[in-house]
Amino acid sequence: MYKQFNANITVLIFIFVISGCSWNSRIGNKDFYYRESILLKANNHAGLITLYRDKLKQKEDDAVRLKLANAYYLTGDTKSSLYYLQPIAHKDDESIYILQAKNLINKDDNIGAAAVINKLLAISPNNAEAYNLIGIVFANNGEISNSETAFEKSRALFIPDEIAMNNLAVAAMFDDRYSDAIRILLPDYLAGKRNPLMLHNLVFSLIQLGDKQYAKKIIIAEKMAKDPDELILALSQVDNLSQQKLPTRENNE
């Protein structure tokens, strides 16, 4: 009798522990947003992925699913981002289309990206990000004139100037117009803007035009490398820039 009673207590305790763990794993909305705000401030994408996955285990939510897909995108995991987007990919939503297009561009699927961007423009004809992304598609396809037109349209629709100007500069670089790239980037640098991608493109363009002295001055001032001469040598040996791809993450996040 005692053994049976003891066994029953053990089972009850075991069940209680399991139930307690399950209860603790449920995230209330207040706690969810609190944790999310901390993780966002820390740029802790891995933590955000865990948080969003746990929330979706409790209940399906399109907004949380989109956040999960975006967190995967920000870690560079295009495959997972597209996978978790799939259940909501059919919905006419600007944010969904934008994230789809970014992922497809990163996969070098410019045809697929263009198709998604066209859907985006159909529901949002004046979407600045749509024109920025189609500009990237054009640039990656070697259609430099079309890419510049798209970037200018994006800028006219008030995408951040830093994004527009950098992409216009890269389009010029793809076309071996390094003096144009410097003309676009240098004013922002002199105005105190220090975006890492912009700095890299400015230094690269200066080196391509033979102004290694000014390039070295910027590298030292901005602490871009421990050995400025080594970086200059490496950048001076880069060729076939037109074979490179214009990224999406640095321009939009």
Segments (PLM) and residue ranges:
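N-terminal leader/linker segments that initiate helical-solenoid repeat arrays
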Residues: 20-83, 250-253
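Structural marker of alpha-solenoid helical repeat scaffolds
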Residues: 57-58, 90-91, 123, 156-158, ...
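Canonical positions in the second alpha-helix
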Residues: 54-55, 85-88, 119-120, 153-155, ...
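Structural signature of tandem alpha-helical TPR/SEL1-like repeats
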Residues: 42-50, 75-84, 107-116, 141-153, ...
